């Protein structure tokens, strides 16, 4: 049982702290990015250096780049290469792990999950578009039991950034996440039911961890392929990856320049 006394001040203090955090200028940004090809244009743009003695943990494949741009400490975190296959560790599990480790070790003011995605042309997406995500869901966690079905969908809002959206004139839409590049019939049914515009393999997992640890998160997603288009997804993805990651870097740079000197409530 809590002791008697001035309990009111104990209750109010976290609210004051939370308010001061919102009004304090943003000083630390972490980018969570799944693929090296998606990350390197941003790393090169800001002249970031790879950390050799990573605070994220010893003996892990995770890659951390760090540096300073204007008044911001910028960290870019990637899950690195699969030890057996040598390819990027894409998908929800690696994304969840590096998001958790990054928040714990780097204590960012805000997380930006930047990467490529599939888009639906019926929802207005085009190759090369960079979207600011409104909210995220999963499309491959099918649990047909009351309440568990909602848990499976996992709807979460991105941090609201109306001023950023207006300044950069970005498209906005819902992102649906699953662990497959292709889209099964069941996936498609849920994506349509959830009214998603974009499809990726990490976003909702990053959102889950950010929500768990109460860190604001925004999502920048650049369209490499049209899920409802005529070309095979894998072929179109690889064909457009280089050009689209350049577009992603350009938008991410504008986002960083907008964030600099502002607090969370300014976004």
Swiss-Prot record:
Observed effect of gene inactivation: No visible phenotype under normal growth condition. Not able to grow with methylthioadenosine (MTA) as unique source of sulfur.
UniProt GO cellular component terms: cytosol; plasma membrane
InterPro entries: MTAN, Nucleoside_phosphorylase_d, Nucleoside_phosphorylase_sf
UniProt-annotated binding residues for adenine: 199, 225
Tissues expressed in: Expressed in roots, leaves, stems, cauline leaves and flowers.
pH dependence: Optimum pH is 8.0.
Entry-linked Gene3D superfamilies: Nucleoside phosphorylase domain
GO biological process: L-methionine salvage from methylthioadenosine; nucleoside metabolic process; phloem or xylem histogenesis
Reaction equation(s) it catalyzes: S-methyl-5'-thioadenosine + H2O = 5-(methylsulfanyl)-D-ribose + adenine
Binding-site residues, S-methyl-5'-thioadenosine: 116, 199-202, 225
The protein's enzyme class: hydrolase
One Gene Ontology molecular-function label: methylthioadenosine nucleosidase activity
Pathway info: Amino-acid biosynthesis; L-methionine biosynthesis via salvage pathway; S-methyl-5-thio-alpha-D-ribose 1-phosphate from S-methyl-5'-thioadenosine (hydrolase route): step 1/2
Enzyme Commission number: 3.2.2.16
Pfam families: PNP_UDP_1
Top-level lineage group: Eukaryota
Active site: 38 (proton acceptor), 225 (proton donor)
SUPFAM superfamilies on file: Purine and uridine phosphorylases
The UniProt record lists the keyword Hydrolase: yes
Activity regulation information from UniProt: Inhibited by CBL3 in a calcium-dependent manner. Inhibited by 5'-methylthiotubercidin (MTT) and by formycin A (FMA).
Stated role: Enzyme of the methionine cycle that catalyzes the irreversible cleavage of the glycosidic bond in 5'-methylthioadenosine (MTA) to adenine and 5'-methylthioribose. Contributes to the maintenance of AdoMet homeostasis and is required to sustain high rates of ethylene synthesis. Inactive towards S-adenosylhomocysteine (SAH/AdoHcy).
Family: Belongs to the PNP/UDP phosphorylase family. MtnN subfamily.
Name of the featured protein: 5'-methylthioadenosine nucleosidase
Organism: Arabidopsis thaliana (Mouse-ear cress)
Classification of source organism: Eukaryota, Viridiplantae, Streptophyta, Embryophyta, Tracheophyta
Record gene name: MTN1
């Amino acid at each position: 049982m809590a002791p008697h006394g001035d309990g009111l001040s104990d209750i109010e203090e976290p609210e004051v702290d939370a308010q001061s955090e919102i009004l304090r200028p943003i000083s630390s940004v972490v980018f969570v990015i799944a693929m090296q090809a998606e990350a390197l244009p941003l790393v090169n743009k800001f002249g970031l250096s790879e950390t050799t003695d990573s605070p994220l943990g010893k003996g892990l494949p995770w890659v951390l780049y760090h540096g300073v741009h204007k008044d911001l400490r910028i960290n870019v975190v990637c899950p690195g290469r699969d030890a057996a296959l040598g390819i990027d560790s894409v998908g929800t599990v690696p994304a969840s792990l590096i998001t958790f480790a990054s928040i714990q070790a780097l204590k960012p003011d805000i997380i930006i999950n930047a990467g490529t995605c599939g888009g639906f042309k019926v929802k207005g997406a085009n190759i090369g578009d960079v979207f600011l995500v409104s909210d995220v869901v999963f499309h491959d966690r099918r649990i047909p039991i009351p309440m568990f079905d909602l848990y499976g969908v996992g709807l979460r809002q991105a941090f609201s950034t109306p001023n950023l959206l207006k300044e950069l004139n970005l498209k906005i839409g819902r992102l649906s996440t699953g662990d497959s590049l292709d889209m099964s019939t069941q996936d498609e049914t849920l994506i349509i039911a959830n009214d998603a515009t974009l499809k990726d393999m990490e976003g909702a997992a990053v959102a889950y961890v950010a929500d768990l640890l109460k860190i604001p998160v925004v999502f920048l997603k650049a369209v490499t392929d049209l899920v409802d288009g005529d070309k095979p997804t894998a072929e179109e993805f690889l064909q457009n990856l280089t050009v689209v990651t350049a577009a992603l870097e350009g938008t991410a740079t504008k986002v960083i320049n907008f964030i600099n000197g502002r607090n969370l409530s300014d976004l």
